[in-house]
Amino acid sequence: MAGVGDVGAVVSTIGHGTLPAEAFSALLAEAGVGRVVDVRSYPGSRHNPQFGREEMERWLPAAGIDYRWLRALGGRRRPLPASRHIALRHDAFRAYADHMATPEFLDGVDELLTASAELPTAVMCSESVWWRCHRRLLADHLVLVRRVDVVHLMHDGRRTDHAPTAGVRAADGQVVYDVGVTPPLPGT
């Protein structure tokens, strides 16, 4: 597994929200981002068509920023019937945490870190704030398992270093969300 010593990466995260394309690309340029890795499972938006995959493949390079879609890191996953991530209250987050143990996810992280070693990279999803998005869990993995620094870019220009989610721990090359929670007894 690659780590910061291997790839020298700092990964940023950003959510496009409802920003105009020009404001979004200006935020990226101000942060020194040269590549966007789209981590939406379905890279389109009816409400913000400028953030559809084909549109971004056109206007981001015109702004001097490379664009890649990486479905392996996308959200909207199905939870396992007996997820071990009991510290996560929302099914969508538990489902993504379950996905993070798959070879697809781990290969996607390798691809992300390779891309980040080539150009300063931001992973992007639609949710404006990182703590309500699967980018939060991806950042936990990058920080705790891969030892990569993660910075969250906000629409107002603020940059926040990632602090791992409450209840998370690293174990055997994965993150597990179970700290401080007693598992339910079988049959209850």
Give each language-model segment a name.
Residues 1-188:
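Residues lining hydrophobic/aromatic ligand-binding pockets adjacent to catalytic sites
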